[in-house]
Design a protein with these regions (language model features):
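Short, well-ordered alpha-helix to beta-strand connector turns
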Residues: 22, 55, 78, 100, ...
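NAD(P)+-binding Rossmann beta1-loop-alpha1 motif at the extreme N-terminus of oxidoreductases
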Residues: 1-46, 50-57, 96, 115, ...
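Internal alpha-helical scaffold of NAD(P)-dependent oxidoreductase catalytic cores
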Residues: 39, 92-101, 117-159, 171-209, ...
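NAD(P)-dependent Rossmann-like dehydrogenase/reductase catalytic/cofactor-binding core
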Residues: 130, 197-256
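Small-residue helix-packing motif on alpha-helices
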Residues: 33, 51, 67, 188-195, ...
């Protein structure tokens, strides 16, 4: 499958690196497209329409506000389209690309290392018993290469964005805070970074193997009245749960 990228920003680069194969691409900043094509062994093309004509699957990585303008250039020649645009539901995408297969995915930056989660939006208009077409299967398998694929109702994809697409920045901040705390108490920053990130990666794998039972893992680490219990109590007093809830509200633009 020839993959064509419309836009060569951070997420487009992460996906291309995760796929590890040549891509066709276009970006208004020509240097970005050229750099990505050179890195991946692909080709930077001269227009959105040229990408559409040469790709088997066009992946929309542009700004959401550009949907109508870019669809006017891409739709006449595109064979299939996958969108990673935020706050752009399937109905709106299908309206812009009415005569071809259209898919909506939500990746996150760890796609670069084939890690993290990838959300696929389920089509609310599709009959439950309808079978996947060959292109449906090929596109789903392509994005599943980038991480753990989770299918959600289209209406929930933007909520998922606050949980996983934004989460690498949140996790990086948590790591930074832990490293800073250790550094202030004498551990060199390089060693503190290794300690925290290795523990984070190991805990994520442990949770996967324990069927995501966070309570069970916490109980194994936490002895009554012990140091971990005191640390957890301090985090709760500091409003850790409320902070993450507020962050999700901020992402969704909600007011409470």
């Amino acid at each position: 499958m020839n993959i064509g990228l419309i836009g060569c920003g951070n997420m487009a680069r992460a996906m291309a690196r995760g796929w590890g194969r040549p891509v066709l691409c276009f970006d208004p900043v020509a240097e970005r497209a050229q750099a990505l094509a050179q890195e991946m062994g692909g080709k930077a093309l001269g227009s959105n329409a040229e990408v559409a004509a040469r790709a088997d699957l066009v992946v929309l990585c542009h700004k959401p506000a550009q949907l109508g303008r870019i669809a006017a250039e891409v739709a006449p020649a595109a064979k299939a389209v996958a969108s990673i645009l935020a706050a752009t539901p399937l109905a709106k995408l299908k309206s812009a690309y009415p005569d071809i297969p259209v898919y909506r995915f939500l990746p996150s930056l760890p796609a670069e290392v084939r890690g993290g989660a990838i959300v696929q939006a389920s089509d609310p208009r599709r009959e439950p018993e309808s079978a996947d077409t060959p292109i449906d299967t090929e596109v789903r398998e392509l994005f599943a290469e980038l991480g753990t694929l989770v299918v959600l109702d289209d209406s929930l994809v933007d909520v998922a964005m606050g949980l996983m697409s934004c989460a690498p920045a949140y996790v990086a901040l948590v790591v930074e805070a832990q490293v800073d705390a250790g550094t202030r108490r004498g551990i060199p920053p390089a060693q503190a970074s290794v300690l925290v990130t290795a523990t984070l990666a190991g805990t994520a794998e442990l949770l996967r193997r324990r069927d995501y039972d966070t309570l069970a893992v916490r109980r194994e680490v936490t002895s009554p009245g012990g140091v971990t219990a005191r640390g957890l109590a301090a985090l709760e007093r500091g409003g850790l749960r409320a902070a993450f809830d507020d962050a999700l509200d901020a992402v969704l633009g909600e007011q409470r």
